[in-house]
Amino acid sequence: MSSAPLSATELAGMIDHTLLTPEATHNDVAKLVADAKKYGTWSVCVSPSMLPLNLDMGDVHLAVVCGFPSGKHTSAVKAAEAREAIAAGAEEVDMVINLGLVKEGRWEDVTADIAAVKQAVPDPKILKVIIESAVLTDDEIVRACQAAEKAGADFVKTSTGFHPRGGASVEAVKVMADTVGGRLGVKASGGIRDYQTACAMVEAGATRLGVSSTAKILAGAPTE
C-alpha cells in the first residue's frame, strides 16, 4: 500500500456514513443522506425500519443492518429482515454473526446462519458479516472470517459499535485482512473518530470504514 496520505476524496469513497442510534428519526436520516452526498461517501448505513427512504440518494449507496446489534436472532428472522430490506431498496446488508455459536465452536452452524442471509442478499447485492472482533480471540477471528467466506459473504466487518468491549482495532483488522487475502472486503467500524485512526485501519487492510464522525475525519485530511 502506498504511504502517501489519503485525500479526503479517497477516504470518503471508503466510508459508510452511519446512523444507528435507537432514537434516530427520519429527519436525522434525511440529514445523513444530505451530508453523505456533500462529502461523497460510498454509502449511508441505517436501521431497516427507516426503509424505504424515498430520498434522492445521488451516487450514495444504501446499506442497512440485520440482526443488529446482538446477532441472537434466528437465521430465519435474519434472512427475512434482509430480504425485506433488499425489497425496500437496500444495496448492502451488514448482518451480525451469532457470537454464541462462535464461542461454542459450532462453525458449521455459524456458516449456515450466514448462508441463510446470503440467500436473501443475492449478487450483486453486498453482504457484510459483523464478527464483533473485540470479544474474539485471534483464532476465533480467523475461523469467523473463514465461515463468512465459505457462506458466500462479500465482506467481513469488525464491530457493531455497540458492544461494551469496544470496536475496531488495527490488530483485528490485520488478522481479518490476512485471513481473507483480498477475496473479501474488510470493513472497520466502531470507535473510528479521527483521520489518523481511519488511515491506520486502511493501512492495516480495511477496504471500507463504518463511521458516524465523517465530517471530523475528513477535516483531518491534507488539503487537496
UniProtKB/Swiss-Prot annotation:
GO molecular function, one term: deoxyribose-phosphate aldolase activity
Disulfide bond entries: none
EC numbers: 4.1.2.4
Coiled coil: none
TM annotation in the entry: none
Reaction catalyzed: 2-deoxy-D-ribose 5-phosphate = D-glyceraldehyde 3-phosphate + acetaldehyde
Primary location: cytoplasm
Compartment(s) where it occurs, according to its Swiss-Prot or TrEMBL record: Cytoplasm
Pathway(s) annotated for this protein in UniProt: Carbohydrate degradation; 2-deoxy-D-ribose 1-phosphate degradation; D-glyceraldehyde 3-phosphate and acetaldehyde from 2-deoxy-alpha-D-ribose 1-phosphate: step 2/2
Domain of life: Bacteria
One GO biological process term: 2-deoxyribose 1-phosphate catabolic process
The keyword Transport belongs to this UniProt entry's keyword annotation: no
NCBIfam families: deoC
Name the UniProt record assigns to this protein: Deoxyribose-phosphate aldolase 2
Gene source species: Cutibacterium acnes (strain DSM 16379 / KPA171202) (Propionibacterium acnes)
Gene label: deoC2
